[in-house]
């Protein structure tokens, strides 16, 4: 019997060959050079895979093969007008079939020529754009890897986002590889920060919410310590915080006592129904904060508890001691990065806790290796599936109207409603959650003779209020 020839599955190699042999390869390369010059001129900030690749080039590494066609993703504080301007430039230079269209990600505009995408421009509010850390590679501004980490953690926090290509299938492996490279070449230095603590007691429902923030760190640390004792490993010497907690429960609530930093004494909870939980708990809403890009959701603040809204999302969670629902370590890491970005005065504190959480995961991994050697594969799999220290697809259960319905889905539904001229029934679970599509950016095609849309109003559409601004509540 003849043996089969060995197949070369080097995808990158064949992608390069395919790009070079495309009929319009020369035109695409020329268009990308125009885009590159535009990015430099407008001082826009590259992000995504290309930013990671360029940052790694500065360290002698990469994620893409040499010569691969760049995929330009960029942030702009005026992305709609910039996208229109780039389309005009390409059209004036003689490129064909030029157009700018709204992407699936609502804050992104895509520019194409000859039906090939050459640029994605995403909105970043000026207050963030002007302060975000960057590096420079060949005259191009790229987002600093410290900020890029946040986007990589994000996919692990919401495993069922972006259906039908859910992140658990399409992003987990790729983002983990990229994160490990960033951690290797751009580690965040450990700078100890001394904090004073106070013991705080909170009464919270044991359904609909997940413990987050500094309290979640305390729960994860003590769970790690209990696992260390079980594995009979000597106590570690560490400079990282070692807060403690205790709790008891009744039929409806959990009373949690936990060591909290005096600078941040409020308990943070994640929930898909913040206003409902606040009402159920009899609390008074004092302040509402808009999202901070994709990295922090709307925050509903009361005097002692801050609620991170995960409405329309399914948040990855863990269960500790069969009773306590806690956010995944990935969401906690994202929280500490968000804190470092949004509150520069306490950046060192949040980054210290970020590194402390990484340390917890590192030590947990060493303990899991011990357990794996001492148990059967079946027993270890069962144990790992309930561990709070591993990537998980267990999510905070939610009612139908508050599950995974992305802005893209709701915009698509709003388009269908507009075209059919038939409103959703008032009883439909999304009847009060459809965006006003008349306030979204318009597509633009320079060669079709239609007048270019002007003066897009970012403040008029809530989907673009993503600068983290907080306002007192009228409630």
UniProtKB/Swiss-Prot annotation:
Family recorded in the similarity comment: Belongs to the poxviridae poly(A) polymerase catalytic subunit family. Highly divergent.
The reaction(s) this protein catalyses: RNA(n) + ATP = RNA(n)-3'-adenine ribonucleotide + diphosphate
Family annotation (InterPro entries): PolyA_pol_cat_su (IPR045355)
Record bears the keyword RNA-binding: no
Induction: Expressed in the late phase of the viral replicative cycle.
Subcellular location(s) per record: Virion
Domain of life: Viruses
Protein name: Putative poly(A) polymerase catalytic subunit
EC number: 2.7.7.19
The organism of origin for this protein: African swine fever virus (isolate Tick/South Africa/Pretoriuskop Pr4/1996) (ASFV)
GO molecular-function terms, A-Z: ATP binding; poly(A) RNA polymerase activity
Function according to Swiss-Prot or TrEMBL: Polymerase that creates the 3'-poly(A) tail of mRNA's.
UniProt entry tagged with the keyword DNA damage: no
Major enzyme class: transferase
GO BP annotations, alphabetical order: mRNA processing
Keywords attached to this entry: ATP-binding, Late protein, mRNA processing, Nucleotide-binding, Transcription, Transferase, Virion
GO cellular component, one term: virion component
